[in-house]
Amino acid sequence: MGEQQYLANLGITALNEMQQTVSSTYNAANDLLLLSPTGSGKTLAFSLIIQKRLHDDDNGKIQSLIIAPTRELALQIEQVLRKMPNHPKVTCLYGGNDLRTEKNKLKEAPQILVGTPGRIIYHLERHNIDLSHLNTLVLDEFDKSLELGFHEQMEQIVAETGAPFQMLTSATELEEIPPFLTLKNLETINYLHEKGYAPDLTFRTVTAAPQNKLKALLKLICKLGSEQKTLIFCNHREAVDHISELLADRDIIHDVFHGGLEQADRELALLKFRNGSTHILLTTDLAARGLDIPEVDAIIHYQLPYKQDAFVHRNGRTARMQAKGTVYLMLKTEDDFPYLTDAMQEEILEDEYPLPTNSKMTTLMITAGKRDKVSKGDIVGYLIKIAGIAKDEVGMIEVKEKNAFVAVTRSSVTTILQKGNNGKIKGTKVRILRS
Protein backbone atom coordinates (compact mmCIF):
# COMPACT_ATOMS: atom_id res chain seq x y z
CA MET A 1 0.00 0.00 0.00
CA GLY A 2 2.86 2.37 0.87
CA GLU A 3 4.55 1.86 -2.51
CA GLN A 4 1.34 2.50 -4.46
CA GLN A 5 0.66 5.67 -2.48
CA TYR A 6 4.24 6.81 -3.10
CA LEU A 7 3.81 6.32 -6.85
CA ALA A 8 0.49 8.16 -6.74
CA ASN A 9 2.15 11.08 -4.92
CA LEU A 10 4.70 11.24 -7.74
CA GLY A 11 2.04 11.04 -10.43
CA ILE A 12 3.31 7.65 -11.62
CA THR A 13 0.95 4.78 -12.40
CA ALA A 14 3.47 1.92 -12.43
CA LEU A 15 7.17 1.13 -12.05
CA ASN A 16 9.20 0.54 -15.18
CA GLU A 17 11.03 -2.75 -15.71
CA MET A 18 14.32 -1.52 -14.24
CA GLN A 19 12.63 -0.21 -11.10
CA GLN A 20 10.70 -3.47 -10.69
CA THR A 21 13.95 -5.42 -11.03
CA VAL A 22 15.65 -3.29 -8.37
CA SER A 23 12.69 -3.69 -6.02
CA SER A 24 12.53 -7.47 -6.44
CA THR A 25 16.32 -7.95 -6.33
CA TYR A 26 16.77 -5.96 -3.13
CA ASN A 27 17.96 -8.09 -0.25
CA ALA A 28 19.27 -6.51 2.93
CA ALA A 29 22.15 -9.01 2.95
CA ASN A 30 23.47 -7.86 -0.44
CA ASP A 31 24.77 -4.47 -1.55
CA LEU A 32 23.60 -3.20 -4.94
CA LEU A 33 25.20 -1.62 -8.01
CA LEU A 34 22.64 -0.17 -10.44
CA LEU A 35 23.84 0.67 -13.95
CA SER A 36 21.14 2.39 -15.98
CA PRO A 37 21.01 5.25 -18.50
CA THR A 38 20.37 8.85 -17.59
CA GLY A 39 16.64 9.48 -17.37
CA SER A 40 15.62 5.88 -16.68
CA GLY A 41 14.34 6.50 -13.14
CA LYS A 42 17.23 5.54 -10.85
CA THR A 43 16.20 8.05 -8.16
CA LEU A 44 12.84 6.38 -7.61
CA ALA A 45 14.49 2.94 -7.71
CA PHE A 46 16.72 3.64 -4.71
CA SER A 47 14.06 5.74 -2.97
CA LEU A 48 11.80 2.67 -2.82
CA ILE A 49 14.56 0.77 -1.02
CA ILE A 50 15.07 3.65 1.41
CA GLN A 51 11.33 3.63 2.09
CA LYS A 52 11.49 -0.08 2.97
CA ARG A 53 14.43 0.45 5.32
CA LEU A 54 13.05 3.38 7.34
CA HIS A 55 12.12 2.55 10.94
CA ASP A 56 9.84 4.74 13.04
CA ASP A 57 11.59 3.68 16.24
CA ASP A 58 14.81 5.31 14.98
CA ASN A 59 13.33 8.81 14.87
CA GLY A 60 15.87 11.37 15.97
CA LYS A 61 18.71 9.59 14.15
CA ILE A 62 19.90 9.80 10.56
CA GLN A 63 18.95 6.48 8.97
CA SER A 64 19.71 7.06 5.28
CA LEU A 65 22.37 9.13 3.52
CA ILE A 66 22.39 9.87 -0.20
CA ILE A 67 25.52 11.46 -1.65
CA ALA A 68 25.10 13.27 -4.98
CA PRO A 69 27.83 14.93 -7.09
CA THR A 70 25.94 18.19 -7.72
CA ARG A 71 23.60 20.42 -5.73
CA GLU A 72 21.02 20.34 -8.52
CA LEU A 73 20.85 16.55 -8.34
CA ALA A 74 20.73 16.65 -4.54
CA LEU A 75 17.75 19.03 -4.67
CA GLN A 76 15.99 16.83 -7.20
CA ILE A 77 16.46 13.75 -4.99
CA GLU A 78 15.12 15.69 -2.01
CA GLN A 79 11.90 16.45 -3.88
CA VAL A 80 11.35 12.78 -4.76
CA LEU A 81 11.96 11.69 -1.16
CA ARG A 82 9.53 14.29 0.20
CA LYS A 83 6.72 12.54 -1.69
CA MET A 84 6.97 9.46 0.55
CA PRO A 85 3.55 8.78 2.10
CA ASN A 86 4.86 8.57 5.67
CA HIS A 87 6.49 12.02 5.30
CA PRO A 88 9.93 11.32 6.81
CA LYS A 89 12.03 14.33 7.69
CA VAL A 90 14.40 15.02 4.78
CA THR A 91 17.25 17.55 4.85
CA CYS A 92 19.40 18.58 1.90
CA LEU A 93 22.93 19.98 2.31
CA TYR A 94 24.84 21.56 -0.57
CA GLY A 95 27.39 24.23 -1.37
CA GLY A 96 25.94 27.68 -1.88
CA ASN A 97 23.15 27.12 0.62
CA ASP A 98 22.99 29.22 3.79
CA LEU A 99 25.11 27.49 6.45
CA ARG A 100 23.14 28.88 9.38
CA THR A 101 19.89 27.58 7.91
CA GLU A 102 21.41 24.14 7.40
CA LYS A 103 22.78 24.05 10.95
CA ASN A 104 19.36 24.95 12.37
CA LYS A 105 17.70 22.21 10.34
CA LEU A 106 20.21 19.69 11.67
CA LYS A 107 19.45 20.45 15.33
CA GLU A 108 16.73 17.85 15.00
CA ALA A 109 18.30 15.03 13.01
CA PRO A 110 16.47 14.11 9.80
CA GLN A 111 15.63 10.51 9.00
CA ILE A 112 17.03 11.01 5.50
CA LEU A 113 20.00 13.20 4.63
CA VAL A 114 20.87 14.19 1.05
CA GLY A 115 23.93 16.19 0.15
CA THR A 116 27.05 16.92 -1.84
CA PRO A 117 30.38 15.54 -0.55
CA GLY A 118 32.01 18.82 0.47
CA ARG A 119 29.03 20.13 2.42
CA ILE A 120 28.49 16.81 4.23
CA ILE A 121 32.12 16.84 5.34
CA TYR A 122 31.76 20.45 6.52
CA HIS A 123 28.97 19.44 8.90
CA LEU A 124 30.68 16.20 9.92
CA GLU A 125 33.81 18.06 10.99
CA ARG A 126 31.72 20.45 13.08
CA HIS A 127 29.74 17.59 14.65
CA ASN A 128 26.47 18.90 13.25
CA ILE A 129 25.59 15.44 11.96
CA ASP A 130 26.03 11.96 13.41
CA LEU A 131 26.22 9.09 10.91
CA SER A 132 26.93 6.35 13.42
CA HIS A 133 23.35 5.00 13.28
CA LEU A 134 23.11 4.97 9.49
CA ASN A 135 21.48 1.88 7.99
CA THR A 136 21.47 2.89 4.30
CA LEU A 137 24.12 4.63 2.18
CA VAL A 138 23.43 5.54 -1.46
CA LEU A 139 26.16 6.91 -3.71
CA ASP A 140 24.15 8.32 -6.61
CA GLU A 141 25.82 9.02 -9.97
CA PHE A 142 28.94 7.50 -8.42
CA ASP A 143 30.88 7.69 -11.69
CA LYS A 144 30.22 11.42 -11.90
CA SER A 145 31.42 11.93 -8.32
CA LEU A 146 34.71 10.22 -9.20
CA GLU A 147 34.98 12.23 -12.41
CA LEU A 148 34.57 15.48 -10.45
CA GLY A 149 37.36 14.51 -8.07
CA PHE A 150 35.32 13.65 -4.96
CA HIS A 151 37.25 10.42 -4.28
CA GLU A 152 38.86 11.60 -1.03
CA GLN A 153 35.71 13.28 0.27
CA MET A 154 33.62 10.16 -0.32
CA GLU A 155 36.27 8.01 1.32
CA GLN A 156 36.18 10.26 4.39
CA ILE A 157 32.37 10.10 4.58
CA VAL A 158 32.17 6.34 4.07
CA ALA A 159 34.70 5.84 6.88
CA GLU A 160 32.25 7.60 9.23
CA THR A 161 29.27 5.43 8.39
CA GLY A 162 29.59 1.65 8.41
CA ALA A 163 26.08 1.39 6.94
CA PRO A 164 24.92 -2.25 6.72
CA PHE A 165 23.41 -1.64 3.26
CA GLN A 166 25.10 0.29 0.46
CA MET A 167 23.90 1.07 -3.05
CA LEU A 168 25.76 2.66 -5.95
CA THR A 169 24.15 4.03 -9.10
CA SER A 170 25.88 4.96 -12.33
CA ALA A 171 24.91 5.89 -15.88
CA THR A 172 28.14 4.41 -17.28
CA GLU A 173 30.13 1.21 -16.76
CA LEU A 174 32.54 1.43 -13.83
CA GLU A 175 36.12 0.45 -14.62
CA GLU A 176 36.68 -0.44 -10.99
CA ILE A 177 35.18 0.12 -7.57
CA PRO A 178 37.56 2.02 -5.26
CA PRO A 179 38.94 -0.03 -2.35
CA PHE A 180 37.51 2.35 0.27
CA LEU A 181 34.11 0.83 -0.49
CA THR A 182 33.71 -2.48 1.30
CA LEU A 183 30.76 -4.01 -0.51
CA LYS A 184 29.28 -7.31 0.61
CA ASN A 185 27.76 -9.88 -1.75
CA LEU A 186 27.49 -7.21 -4.43
CA GLU A 187 24.62 -7.65 -6.86
CA THR A 188 24.85 -5.77 -10.16
CA ILE A 189 21.76 -4.74 -12.11
CA ASN A 190 22.76 -3.57 -15.58
CA TYR A 191 20.28 -1.85 -17.88
CA LEU A 192 22.80 0.17 -19.88
CA HIS A 193 22.34 -1.95 -22.98
CA GLU A 194 18.76 -3.12 -22.52
CA LYS A 195 16.42 -2.48 -25.42
CA GLY A 196 13.97 0.27 -24.51
CA TYR A 197 16.40 1.91 -22.07
CA ALA A 198 18.77 3.26 -24.68
CA PRO A 199 17.42 6.68 -25.75
CA ASP A 200 15.35 6.74 -28.95
CA LEU A 201 17.36 9.43 -30.70
CA THR A 202 17.57 10.81 -34.20
CA PHE A 203 20.93 12.39 -35.05
CA ARG A 204 21.47 15.25 -37.48
CA THR A 205 24.60 17.21 -38.40
CA VAL A 206 24.92 20.89 -39.24
CA THR A 207 28.23 21.59 -40.98
CA ALA A 208 29.50 25.15 -41.26
CA ALA A 209 32.75 27.03 -41.66
CA PRO A 210 34.06 28.44 -38.34
CA GLN A 211 33.11 32.01 -39.24
CA ASN A 212 29.53 30.92 -40.09
CA LYS A 213 28.87 28.65 -37.13
CA LEU A 214 26.95 31.21 -35.05
CA LYS A 215 24.78 32.11 -38.03
CA ALA A 216 24.04 28.43 -38.58
CA LEU A 217 23.07 28.04 -34.92
CA LEU A 218 20.67 30.97 -35.15
CA LYS A 219 19.08 29.48 -38.28
CA LEU A 220 18.67 26.11 -36.56
CA ILE A 221 17.07 27.71 -33.49
CA CYS A 222 14.65 29.60 -35.73
CA LYS A 223 13.86 26.47 -37.75
CA LEU A 224 13.04 24.51 -34.59
CA GLY A 225 10.64 27.30 -33.62
CA SER A 226 9.12 28.29 -30.31
CA GLU A 227 7.46 24.98 -29.38
CA GLN A 228 10.61 22.84 -29.28
CA LYS A 229 12.17 22.59 -25.82
CA THR A 230 15.86 22.83 -26.66
CA LEU A 231 19.11 22.45 -24.72
CA ILE A 232 22.20 23.97 -26.34
CA PHE A 233 25.51 22.60 -25.02
CA CYS A 234 28.86 24.38 -25.08
CA ASN A 235 32.19 23.29 -23.61
CA HIS A 236 32.86 26.58 -21.84
CA ARG A 237 30.73 29.18 -20.07
CA GLU A 238 32.28 31.94 -22.20
CA ALA A 239 30.67 30.38 -25.28
CA VAL A 240 27.35 30.16 -23.44
CA ASP A 241 27.50 33.86 -22.56
CA HIS A 242 28.49 34.81 -26.12
CA ILE A 243 25.55 32.94 -27.66
CA SER A 244 23.27 34.42 -25.01
CA GLU A 245 24.24 37.92 -26.15
CA LEU A 246 23.44 36.97 -29.75
CA LEU A 247 19.98 35.70 -28.81
CA ALA A 248 19.29 38.66 -26.53
CA ASP A 249 20.12 41.08 -29.37
CA ARG A 250 17.34 39.41 -31.36
CA ASP A 251 14.88 39.32 -28.43
CA ILE A 252 14.84 35.52 -28.41
CA ILE A 253 13.73 34.43 -24.94
CA HIS A 254 16.18 31.98 -23.37
CA ASP A 255 18.11 31.26 -20.18
CA VAL A 256 21.66 30.24 -19.30
CA PHE A 257 22.89 27.63 -16.85
CA HIS A 258 26.54 27.20 -15.85
CA GLY A 259 28.86 27.17 -12.86
CA GLY A 260 29.61 30.87 -13.04
CA LEU A 261 26.09 31.78 -11.95
CA GLU A 262 24.85 32.17 -8.40
CA GLN A 263 22.97 29.14 -7.12
CA ALA A 264 19.67 31.04 -6.99
CA ASP A 265 20.05 32.09 -10.63
CA ARG A 266 20.81 28.53 -11.70
CA GLU A 267 17.76 27.19 -9.88
CA LEU A 268 15.55 29.88 -11.42
CA ALA A 269 16.83 29.10 -14.92
CA LEU A 270 15.93 25.42 -14.49
CA LEU A 271 12.56 26.30 -12.97
CA LYS A 272 11.62 28.52 -15.92
CA PHE A 273 12.73 25.85 -18.38
CA ARG A 274 10.62 23.25 -16.57
CA ASN A 275 7.49 25.38 -16.43
CA GLY A 276 7.62 26.46 -20.06
CA SER A 277 8.53 30.12 -19.56
CA THR A 278 11.65 29.50 -21.63
CA HIS A 279 12.10 26.88 -24.33
CA ILE A 280 15.82 27.46 -24.92
CA LEU A 281 18.47 26.76 -22.28
CA LEU A 282 22.15 27.43 -23.00
CA THR A 283 24.41 25.35 -20.80
CA THR A 284 27.71 23.64 -20.16
CA ASP A 285 28.11 20.00 -19.14
CA LEU A 286 26.80 21.02 -15.72
CA ALA A 287 23.33 20.16 -17.08
CA ALA A 288 24.42 16.94 -18.79
CA ARG A 289 23.17 14.60 -16.11
CA GLY A 290 21.22 14.21 -12.92
CA LEU A 291 18.77 17.05 -13.51
CA ASP A 292 15.04 16.63 -13.72
CA ILE A 293 14.25 18.41 -16.98
CA PRO A 294 11.27 16.63 -18.53
CA GLU A 295 10.16 16.69 -22.14
CA VAL A 296 13.28 18.07 -23.81
CA ASP A 297 12.70 17.81 -27.56
CA ALA A 298 16.11 18.66 -28.95
CA ILE A 299 19.77 18.77 -27.99
CA ILE A 300 22.15 21.01 -29.91
CA HIS A 301 25.88 20.40 -29.48
CA TYR A 302 27.25 23.80 -30.46
CA GLN A 303 30.59 22.49 -29.25
CA LEU A 304 31.06 18.74 -29.01
CA PRO A 305 32.65 17.36 -25.84
CA TYR A 306 36.08 15.80 -25.95
CA LYS A 307 34.99 12.49 -24.40
CA GLN A 308 32.33 10.04 -25.54
CA ASP A 309 30.89 9.67 -22.01
CA ALA A 310 30.07 13.38 -21.91
CA PHE A 311 28.44 13.10 -25.34
CA VAL A 312 26.25 10.23 -24.13
CA HIS A 313 25.20 12.08 -20.97
CA ARG A 314 24.32 15.25 -22.85
CA ASN A 315 22.11 13.23 -25.18
CA GLY A 316 20.47 11.63 -22.14
CA ARG A 317 18.75 14.95 -21.43
CA THR A 318 16.28 14.17 -24.23
CA ALA A 319 14.35 10.97 -25.05
CA ARG A 320 14.00 10.36 -21.31
CA MET A 321 11.81 7.52 -20.07
CA GLN A 322 11.25 6.03 -23.55
CA ALA A 323 10.29 9.31 -25.23
CA LYS A 324 11.92 10.44 -28.47
CA GLY A 325 14.33 13.26 -29.22
CA THR A 326 16.58 14.78 -31.85
CA VAL A 327 20.27 15.55 -31.43
CA TYR A 328 21.95 18.15 -33.63
CA LEU A 329 25.75 18.18 -33.98
CA MET A 330 27.24 21.45 -35.15
CA LEU A 331 30.46 20.57 -36.94
CA LYS A 332 33.22 22.45 -38.68
CA THR A 333 34.38 20.83 -41.92
CA GLU A 334 37.71 19.82 -40.35
CA ASP A 335 36.22 18.32 -37.15
CA ASP A 336 37.17 14.73 -36.36
CA PHE A 337 35.74 13.10 -33.23
CA PRO A 338 36.70 9.41 -32.87
CA TYR A 339 33.44 8.52 -31.12
CA LEU A 340 31.33 9.74 -34.08
CA THR A 341 31.39 6.56 -36.14
CA ASP A 342 27.88 6.32 -37.55
CA ALA A 343 26.82 8.16 -40.66
CA MET A 344 24.37 10.96 -39.84
CA GLN A 345 22.00 12.89 -42.05
CA GLU A 346 22.82 16.55 -42.68
CA GLU A 347 20.15 19.04 -41.56
CA ILE A 348 19.31 21.34 -44.45
CA LEU A 349 18.99 25.00 -43.44
CA GLU A 350 17.36 27.62 -45.64
CA ASP A 351 18.69 31.17 -45.93
CA GLU A 352 16.08 32.67 -43.59
CA TYR A 353 13.51 31.64 -40.99
CA PRO A 354 11.18 33.78 -38.88
CA LEU A 355 12.36 34.41 -35.32
CA PRO A 356 10.73 32.15 -32.70
CA THR A 357 7.67 33.63 -31.04
CA ASN A 358 7.61 34.15 -27.28
CA SER A 359 6.54 31.26 -25.10
CA LYS A 360 2.92 31.36 -23.97
CA MET A 361 3.88 31.35 -20.27
CA THR A 362 6.05 33.54 -18.07
CA THR A 363 7.11 33.25 -14.42
CA LEU A 364 6.05 35.38 -11.45
CA MET A 365 7.45 35.22 -7.92
CA ILE A 366 5.14 35.47 -4.91
CA THR A 367 6.72 36.48 -1.59
CA ALA A 368 5.23 33.67 0.50
CA GLY A 369 6.25 30.04 0.80
CA LYS A 370 6.37 26.90 2.89
CA ARG A 371 7.29 28.77 6.07
CA ASP A 372 4.00 30.67 5.66
CA LYS A 373 2.08 27.37 5.20
CA VAL A 374 1.19 28.41 1.65
CA SER A 375 0.24 25.62 -0.78
CA LYS A 376 -0.17 25.45 -4.56
CA GLY A 377 -3.93 25.39 -4.09
CA ASP A 378 -3.78 28.59 -2.03
CA ILE A 379 -1.91 30.34 -4.84
CA VAL A 380 -4.29 29.18 -7.57
CA GLY A 381 -7.28 30.24 -5.47
CA TYR A 382 -5.75 33.64 -4.74
CA LEU A 383 -5.00 34.39 -8.40
CA ILE A 384 -8.48 33.35 -9.52
CA LYS A 385 -10.26 35.25 -6.75
CA ILE A 386 -8.18 38.43 -6.48
CA ALA A 387 -6.86 38.83 -10.01
CA GLY A 388 -9.92 37.35 -11.68
CA ILE A 389 -8.00 35.14 -14.11
CA ALA A 390 -9.15 31.75 -15.38
CA LYS A 391 -7.73 28.53 -13.94
CA ASP A 392 -6.25 27.53 -17.30
CA GLU A 393 -4.13 30.70 -17.26
CA VAL A 394 -2.12 29.27 -14.36
CA GLY A 395 0.58 26.70 -15.10
CA MET A 396 3.21 24.95 -13.00
CA ILE A 397 3.69 26.20 -9.42
CA GLU A 398 6.76 25.52 -7.27
CA VAL A 399 6.57 26.50 -3.60
CA LYS A 400 9.94 27.14 -1.93
CA GLU A 401 10.78 27.90 1.69
CA LYS A 402 10.37 31.69 1.54
CA ASN A 403 8.60 32.27 -1.78
CA ALA A 404 6.76 30.60 -4.64
CA PHE A 405 7.10 30.68 -8.41
CA VAL A 406 4.11 30.38 -10.69
CA ALA A 407 3.88 30.14 -14.47
CA VAL A 408 1.05 32.25 -15.89
CA THR A 409 0.03 33.28 -19.38
CA ARG A 410 1.81 36.39 -20.59
CA SER A 411 -1.55 38.00 -21.36
CA SER A 412 -2.57 37.77 -17.68
CA VAL A 413 0.56 39.35 -16.15
CA THR A 414 -0.58 42.98 -16.11
CA THR A 415 -3.88 42.08 -14.43
CA ILE A 416 -2.16 39.92 -11.82
CA LEU A 417 0.40 42.60 -10.95
CA GLN A 418 -2.26 45.31 -10.70
CA LYS A 419 -4.82 43.37 -8.66
CA GLY A 420 -2.76 40.76 -6.84
CA ASN A 421 -0.04 42.87 -5.23
CA ASN A 422 -0.26 43.58 -1.49
CA GLY A 423 -3.08 41.11 -0.92
CA LYS A 424 -2.95 38.31 1.66
CA ILE A 425 -2.47 34.58 1.22
CA LYS A 426 -3.03 32.57 4.41
CA GLY A 427 -2.79 35.84 6.37
CA THR A 428 0.57 36.77 4.84
CA LYS A 429 0.78 40.00 2.85
CA VAL A 430 2.40 39.24 -0.49
CA ARG A 431 4.10 41.02 -3.32
CA ILE A 432 4.11 39.60 -6.83
CA LEU A 433 7.17 40.22 -8.99
CA ARG A 434 8.37 39.28 -12.46
CA SER A 435 11.12 36.65 -12.47
Give a label for each model feature.
Residues N16-Q19, L35-S40, L65-R71, L139-K144, ...:
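Conserved helicase ATPase motor motifs in RecA-like P-loop NTPase domains
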Residues Q20-L32, T43-N59, L75, V80-M84:
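Walker A/P-loop NTP-binding motif
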Residues G96-N97, E173-L220:
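Interdomain hinge/linker at the junction between the two RecA-like core domains of SF2 helicases
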Residues Y122, D130-E194, L340-A343:
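Post-DEXD/H (motif II) to motif III coupling segment of the RecA-like Helicase ATP-binding lobe
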Residues M1-L35:
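Conserved pre-motif I regulatory segment
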Residues I280, K307-D351:
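Conserved segment of the helicase C-terminal RecA-like domain
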Residues Q156, P199-A248, G388:
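Conserved interdomain hinge at the start of the Helicase C-terminal
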Residues Q5, N59-E125, H133-T136, H242-G259, ...:
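Conserved nucleic-acid-binding Ia/Ib motif block in the N-terminal RecA-like helicase ATPase lobe
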